Amino acid sequence: MTMLSDLPKIPTLDWADFAEGDTDQRLKLAQGLVQGFKRFGFVKLVNHGLSDELIQQLFAEVKRFYRLPDELKQKAAHPPGPNPQRGWSGIGVESTSKLYGEQTERPSGKLKDAKVGTDFSSSKLSRELTHMKEHYDIGPPTDTQFPTRWPDEQDIPGWRAFMESYYARGQSFCLDLMEALEIGLELPKNTLRSMCIPDGSELRLLHYPEIPAAELRTGDTARIWPHTDFGLITLLFQDGVGGLEVEDPLQQGHYIEVAREQPYEMIVNVSATFERWMNGVIKAAVHRVNITPEGKHVEDAVVPERWSAAYFFKAHKMAHAGPLPAFVTPERPALYDNITALEFQKRRTDLVYTGQQLKVEEAA
């Protein structure tokens, strides 16, 4: 049985120390970033340079899309399969419980993804069940192999232009973050950055409909099951509803709440490709979206809808996703196979959509 631990606390770092500081301040921030990633796989950043107004508009635009009728969103639907996700995936399409079983060794066949009904006034929960989360994925504007599936401009004017602009801001920030990690890890300049150009990242816009808390208390349902992200790092902005938790690497099964302490703080977590680069020296953060603290104690509570925006920063598609030479030694041989970033993503995406592990030779 998992437990939520109030302590220790995810560290908060001031990004201005790196962006505007002297050599010593930049080094201290870079070292703090590495230390936070090694301990938790998570850090929070303030003064990150993305304005409050930009984040406000981001959430307004996310909500504007999800308020569209399903028939308009369906025009931009992502076709299930192992390819990188592009466009809208409706409730029930993606299932992180398949990743949950893979990563925790708990049989995934015993799990159900979070379900939502339509009549919360009813005391009965025996209604049609569907998966809880819907999301929309945006890829690189220059990606002609896997282009983003956009809604019609006439249905939501100006939306594509804003999202492409925000995507570019996220990519630029993440490249700076790679520079900081190179300093903190004592790697030669451009060791990490060079494998991220051209970009292969994705911007994901998430909406979690409201759900009766009773469905989340059973232990068989969750908004998102424990999982790790696919790429290098994830930048996350979330609303104040709560529920995001990260597993304490030092206490398996114990989860730390990642509550929003400041309205526009940025949450940054380590993802699976970065763990592979580091040969496991820095591990990807296992995290989930669980019942909110308030929902745990009120019998008939309804957990409100939740909004978030995640920038999945990734290596370019043909970059190697195996361990970097600096982290492979006779005492610590390579722990991961040296496939490309695209092959690794297809392997993971196929598992999410079909529950089947894609073989390396099938991923190309």
Swiss-Prot record:
Fe cation binds at residues 227, 229, 287. Signal peptide: none annotated. Its EC number is 1.14.-.-. Induction: Expression is down-regulated by ralstonins, lipopeptides produced by the plant pathogenic bacteria Ralstonia solanacearum. Expression is positively regulated by the imizoquins cluster-specific transcription regulator imqK. Residues 199-315 form the Fe2OG dioxygenase domain. InterPro entries: DIOX_N (IPR026992), IPNS-like_FE2OG_OXY (IPR044861), IPNS-like_sf (IPR027443), Iron_ascorbate_oxido_reductase (IPR050231), Oxoglu/Fe-dep_dioxygenase_dom (IPR005123). Its cofactor is Fe(2+). 2-oxoglutarate-dependent dioxygenase; part of the gene cluster that mediates the biosynthesis of imizoquins A to D, tripeptide-derived alkaloids that serve a protective role against oxidative stress that are essential for normal germination. ImqB is a canonical three-module NRPS that assembles the tripeptide backbone of the imizoquins via condensation of Trp, Tyr, and Leu-derived precursors. N-methylation by imqF and phenol oxidation by imqC, followed by cyclization via the FAD-dependent oxidase imqH carry out the three-step transformation of L-tyrosine into tetrahydroisoquinoline. PROSITE patterns: FE2OG_OXY (PS51471). Pathway: Secondary metabolite biosynthesis. The keyword Oxidoreductase applies. SUPFAM superfamilies: Clavaminate synthase-like. Residues 73-92 are annotated as: Disordered. Belongs to the iron/ascorbate-dependent oxidoreductase family. It comes from the Eukaryota. Keywords: Iron, Metal-binding, Oxidoreductase. This is 2-oxoglutarate-dependent dioxygenase imqE. Binds 1 Fe(2+) ion per subunit. It comes from Aspergillus flavus (strain ATCC 200026 / FGSC A1120 / IAM 13836 / NRRL 3357 / JCM 12722 / SRRC 167). One of its GO terms (biological process) is small molecule biosynthetic process. It is an enzyme of class 1 (oxidoreductase). 2-oxoglutarate binds at residue 306. GO terms for molecular function: metal ion binding; oxidoreductase activity.
